[in-house]
């Protein structure tokens, strides 16, 4: 059947699951207002009701045996199709460079590989907003669904799907189709949720315009679904708790390094070191150092004892500056050589994508935090060591010398000469905000022009909803992390130049972030997230790592800035969700998690069935990870310090 909406047409069809087969609902049973159909005693129906520029729907089923009902929508005859299921599907998930078999690819090729298929369905609560969308040249359509339904047997979970070439839809009840993507490289058996009697509802959208029209649809659904966490503790308590944990638990005085630590409760609750944190950026180094510097102002005298007991942010930045490589003109990726003596091969080399090279992500992250800290100290009338500026200028001059004519920075660089090895990826965007900070510190116009050229280049990927190639452990999957650099760079350039294009870049960047940042509460099945926890405000890392991580919180300050300069409270609300999310996660320790102390925060939070692979020592499932990887809580420490200082500045 055909549905008319906003002077455009959607093809709509339905199918019900009878045992293991999908049975189409006859088109003769369908009208513009829905359908009503009975098969062997099973009754299925749909009702459509116009509501402004959207179409509300209700699906119902009442059957003698457990069943499901799918609603298919299609937009045939268009070009440049691009499917979106937030957190899961962005086009084909960059299949051109992805390694088949690592994570879902929406494609017809490699049918012999479990994670390559022309149709993908997930639990709706796997998506940051429970909807499936289809973009094409000139339009965007989407169907949103309530992620959960009441049934005769209790709560069932509903589904969202994407299908080549031009279809998408939702399911009352769900099937992980063709398989369950729990973890990269390892397919799990398909699971499903069925019921005899249940109903669900939602809205259908059909907009003209570019792919970024999807952001308005997300915004409208957010207004209906938002359910923010309600933390108990204050920001100051959180900052103190994390700093104390850094200093008194995770710093290893004998090794002279911060460490990542883990345990396995209930058998083993002592947090033991499993990896030294020696990388200069991304998962260590500057990511830790900047918030440690902020703690001095956020906590005052209360910061001095823990900082004295461990390694201060200033000491970390000294080591980062000392990692300068004269041959490459960049920073070595490690502050100290690994066990094999390499100064660049961090933990990520085990994934096989990069080795014996500089990575733009680690180097860019490090120099971003180095220049950000220098800018912060300068703004507050405080000095910083000359070698920090010397290292930052040398690295960023090298990066500018090697910048491509179209604005791109490299993904990897040679360690032996000043040369880009691989251009493909978003990781180099981290150099852009560093260049703006350096301009603010030195007045060097070349830095500003280089950053502007870079943001113009990377904006193409942001507006196309297709930012890929930032982390080195995801095989250049579409990810959330690179866009964080784009947001920071756009904010700094708008502050510096006042150009309207950079304000638009910020809006596009925020919209892309909200395709990863949950706008509603999910109901995970397992400890510790089945005790009232809300996913609202947490952001998923990539299509390769299907879990929420804390990195998105670092742009909350930029979202609050965007709210101020636009007068649009939507961005402030999204930032407030994030602050509440991170504080509630801290409060799960130790009572709900069964281990640790207040101030720990894992990098893995499982709002649905993605990556819920952790197990207690007695075999019970755990919806997080028994590892305290310092970068994760460092991101939260950064966001908490910045918000606390913003609040105190307003009071002053």
Feature-to-residue mapping (PLM):
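Carbohydrate-recognition beta-sandwich/jelly-roll modules
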Residues: 2-390, 394-397
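Alpha-solenoid helical-repeat scaffolds
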Residues: 229, 275-285, 304-307, 353-364, ...
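Long, well-ordered core segments of solenoidal/helical folds
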Residues: 235-275, 308-335, 387-409, 445-469, ...
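Carbohydrate-binding/catalytic loop surfaces
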Residues: 255-278, 329-360, 408-430, 467-489, ...
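Well-ordered alpha-helical scaffold segments within catalytic/enzyme domains
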Residues: 286-305, 365-384, 429-444, 485-499, ...
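Active-site lining segments of carbohydrate-active enzymes
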Residues: 345-354, 371-445, 507-517
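Non-catalytic carbohydrate-binding regions of carbohydrate-active enzymes
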Residues: 402-405, 442, 455-468, 472, ...
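A domain-scale signal for long, ordered structural cores in large, multidomain proteins
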Residues: 421-432, 438-470, 475-508
């Amino acid at each position: 059947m055909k549905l008319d909406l906003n002077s455009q047409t959607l093809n709509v069809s339905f199918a019900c699951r009878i045992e293991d087969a999908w049975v189409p609902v006859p088109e003769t049973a369908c009208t513009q207002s829905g359908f009503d159909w009975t098969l062997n005693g099973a009754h299925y129906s749909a009702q459509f009701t116009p509501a402004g520029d959207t179409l509300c729907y209700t699906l119902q089923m009442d059957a003698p045996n457990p069943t499901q009902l799918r609603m298919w929508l299609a937009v045939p005859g268009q070009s440049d199709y691009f499917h979106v299921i937030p957190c899961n599907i962005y086009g084909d998930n960059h299949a051109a460079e992805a390694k088949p078999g690592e994570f879902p690819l929406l494609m017809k090729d490699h049918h012999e590989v479990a994670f390559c298929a022309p149709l993908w369905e997930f639990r709706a609560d796997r998506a940051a907003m429970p909807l499936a969308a289809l973009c094409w040249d000139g339009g965007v359509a989407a169907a949103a669904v309530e992620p959960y339904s009441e049934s005769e047997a209790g709560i069932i979970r509903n589904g969202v799907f994407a299908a080549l070439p031009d279809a998408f839809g939702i399911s009352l009840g769900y099937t992980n189709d063709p398989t369950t993507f729990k973890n990269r490289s390892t397919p799990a058996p398909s699971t499903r949720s069925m019921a005899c009697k249940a109903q669900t509802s939602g809205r259908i959208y059909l907009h003209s315009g570019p792919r970024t029209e999807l952001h308005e649809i997300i915004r409208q659904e957010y207004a209906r679904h938002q359910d923010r966490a309600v933390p108990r503790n204050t920001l100051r308590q959180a900052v103190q708790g994390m700093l104390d944990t850094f200093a008194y638990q995770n710093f290893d005085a004998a090794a002279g390094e911060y460490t990542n630590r883990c345990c396995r409760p209930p058998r083993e609750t002592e947090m033991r070191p499993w990896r030294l944190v020696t990388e200069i950026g991304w998962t260590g180094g500057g990511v830790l150092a900047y918030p440690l510097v902020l703690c001095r102002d956020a906590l005052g005298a209360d910061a001095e004892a823990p900082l004295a007991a461990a390694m201060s942010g200033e000491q970390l930045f000294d080591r980062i500056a000392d990692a300068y490589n004269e041959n490459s003109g960049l920073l070595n990726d490690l502050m100290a050589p690994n066990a094999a003596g390499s100064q660049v091969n961090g933990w990520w080399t085990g994934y096989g994508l990069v080795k014996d090279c500089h990575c733009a992500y680690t180097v860019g992250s490090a120099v971003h935090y180095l220049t950000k800290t220098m800018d912060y100290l300068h703004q507050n009338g405080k000095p910083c060591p000359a070698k920090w500026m010397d290292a930052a200028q040398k690295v960023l001059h090298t990066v500018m010398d090697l910048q491509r004519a179209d604005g791109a920075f490299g993904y990897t660089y040679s360690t032996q000469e000043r040369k880009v090895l691989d251009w493909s990826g978003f990781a180099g965007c981290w150099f852009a905000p560093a260049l703006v900070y350096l301009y603010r510190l030195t007045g060097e116009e070349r830095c500003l022009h280089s950053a502007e050229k870079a943001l113009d280049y990377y904006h193409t990927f942001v507006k196309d909803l297709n930012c890929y190639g930032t982390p080195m452990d995801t095989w250049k999957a579409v990810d959330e992390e690179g866009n964080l650099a784009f947001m920071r760079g756009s904010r700094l350039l708008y502050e510096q130049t006042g150009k309207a294009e950079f304000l638009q870049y910020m809006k596009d960047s925020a919209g892309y972030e909200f395709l990863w940042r949950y706008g509603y509460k999910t109901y995970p099945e397992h400890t510790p997230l089945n005790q009232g926890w809300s996913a609202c405000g947490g952001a998923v890392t990539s299509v390769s790592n299907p879990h929420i991580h804390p990195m998105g919180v670092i742009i909350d300050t930029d979202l609050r800035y965007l709210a101020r300069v636009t007068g649009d409270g939507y961005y402030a609300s999204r930032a407030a969700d994030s602050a509440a999310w991170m504080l509630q996660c801290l409060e799960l320790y130790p009572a709900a998690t069964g281990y640790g102390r207040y101030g720990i925060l894992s990098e893995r939070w499982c709002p649905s069935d993605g990556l819920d692979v952790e197990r207690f020592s007695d075999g019970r499932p755990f919806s997080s990870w028994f590892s305290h990887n310092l970068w994760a809580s460092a991101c939260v420490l950064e966001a908490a310090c910045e918000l606390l200082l913003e609040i105190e500045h307003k009071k002053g």
